[in-house]
């Protein structure tokens, strides 16, 4: 049976039937005995969750086997390792691992927990179904034969069952909703077998117990973990562990007990301090189961971790201590695990994924726990247990493990995600973290970066370095570092729960409790502390120490990137953090919230951030400044910075480009021309607009000089050019008639400026008029008469009244002068451009244009068109002229002969 795996997905009803049959056949024992299930359950869990029907969940509770069976593919891979793990901690851990794995496998992690250990199972069943509990107890007892846990589970199972029963009930309720559990149950035949008896009995209630297990698992699991812890030699008998677990979930006292126990760190988080694994179990049911089952942090753990990263990861178990932290991260059994957390991707999933909600990952959440194990974590926790905050975090998430369970939040993933979910759970966590509901537990931080944070921190922390180191170690982890890492995720989340994240990172390793502490700062600090000092001392001082820790972590963690980012970010948080415990719930969120903005600002304001991040301490002190900036507004801060750098800069460039030119032009005023430092627009205006104005002025000046502005108007000029000679003649005649009137009336006339004030139109008439008017002097004489007569009239009017004697002489002189002026122009009159001449010119021009231009060019048509039009007009004109000439010469009587113009 051990080697046989089911890949078939069964409905709830089918599973119920199967569980009954399995129970009858005693498959439960075989399933429990099999060492592959735990590992495969991990991997299978993920597969089962989505694929398996929720129905199996009940069986899972009773029989983790079904969940296990659903994970056959993974099981084979991990069988050897799992078996080893099982062999190591198989006695009772085996059961726990199976259960735990199934727990991860089955959505209902609680069920996994039930399976986890006889104790856990009884608890689950006890809470959900007494009958199944008995059958399970029997099965567990059988298993107990190999596992020392047996005794503890039985007593513990019952006691735990009673105290945890409520939790189980609650958890089952949560869990039932999640189909993850059922998927797990179909996972493996072994689990089914094992779970069949226990699960079969609790078949109906199985689902509920399973879900109960979510929380219960947390608690039960812790118990299981404790059981395994006992086997591991954590120093807590299964019973004690269970008691601790019960206590943990029940109250902060549990964390204290846990702290006392030493594994307590995790327990505090996980409720079961007994073993980090246990904590993990509590924290991340899966992990715990793994831990329990891998009681041995040995290879099995790694295997488990691999196959059931979620499970084994949480189990972290990998080496109870180190492993745990590492396990949580399990990413790589060893450091990897820590690092893996980073890696987690799969695992991280668990770790981070947990956040990610990789259902399994929950245990990742345990990730916190993961390094719960790390004693350091424990120390941190121990203080934390004391530390109300820690405890609170725990209480707040007393179960948080269970809270994490809270996984319940996500029944399956539940634990995993839930852990992170803690949002739901967070409450507890939130308590600590209220600030950031999620962040609270490191989850938030993690959540923010599902993976990185948690994983990173926890991991980077290097597996174990103890957590502390890991925390730092990592600068990866540096939770803060993580921010560095992925400042984006981290930052954002970090921002939201930067502290948390850092915390998570450090804290994670340090202890779940810290994460759970839910004080983002606390966690951060815890993490820091953990990193800096094994957490014990720092952790206790959640607030102040944390602040310090935070500072140190910042410096230590390598806020380098984070420094700038987190430096500010964190600083803002740090401030809240500095405020200590209080800000846990309140300020962290602000800090985080600001942090995100800050983050952006930080990025943009890398320089400023670099200043602040000088060191943890620096960041701490700076954080106030930074915080104020953030407070004023992260964006605002960046805006201010931009305004300082950009604003001034922009003005400067503008001043250089625009202001200088305008200033010179303005100052130069009239001397603008001399100013060459002008912009193109100005130059354009100067050369074109000003020039036009000047031209107008010049024209006006010329008009004034001519003293005939009215006559100079263009309309008059146009009239002149288009007027016929007859009209011009009539005007001249009118002028003549006016002259006598002036003479007769001797009306004062305007003072004669020039002897011949002729208008431009008149001048044109004179020079361009055709010969038809008569003698060449005709126009000139008219002009002369018109020009001279006003003067005469004036003279007469002004004089005695008698015309001056010199008038005839004056007229003669004027006439001579005009003749002399016109004589040389006589020939010019013949050259005056008449329409005939213009037509000839145009024809010539058209010919030249057509011959010299490229007729194949795109615009050649324009030239040809103009030439043709002009030529045609000229031809028509010439024809007309010819017709007229003929008529005038022949004077034929028939008018029809002359073509009409």
Curated annotation (Swiss-Prot):
Q: In the record, what lineage is assigned to the organism producing the protein? A: Eukaryota, Metazoa, Chordata, Craniata, Vertebrata
Q: Compositional bias (Polar residues) spans?
A: 100-112, 267-276, 347-379, 387-418, 426-457, 465-484
Q: Which gene encodes it?
A: PERM1
User: Does the record's keyword annotation contain Cytoplasm?
Assistant: yes
One GO cellular component from the entry? cytoplasm
Region annotation (Disordered) maps to 29-511, 564-671, 731-752
Q: What is its main location?
A: cytoplasm
Record keywords, A-Z: Cytoplasm, Nucleus, Transcription, Transcription regulation
Instruction: Write out the biased-composition intervals (Low complexity).
Output: 157-178, 608-624
Q: Which GO terms describe its biological process?
A: regulation of DNA-templated transcription; response to muscle activity
Record-given protein name: PGC-1 and ERR-induced regulator in muscle protein 1
Location in the cell reads: Cytoplasm; Nucleus
Q: What does this protein do?
A: Regulates the expression of selective PPARGC1A/B and ESRRA/B/G target genes with roles in glucose and lipid metabolism, energy transfer, contractile function, muscle mitochondrial biogenesis and oxidative capacity. Required for the efficient induction of MT-CO2, MT-CO3, COX4I1, TFB1M, TFB2M, POLRMT and SIRT3 by PPARGC1A. Positively regulates the PPARGC1A/ESRRG-induced expression of CKMT2, TNNI3 and SLC2A4 and negatively regulates the PPARGC1A/ESRRG-induced expression of PDK4.
Q: Which InterPro entries match?
A: Perm1 (IPR043442)
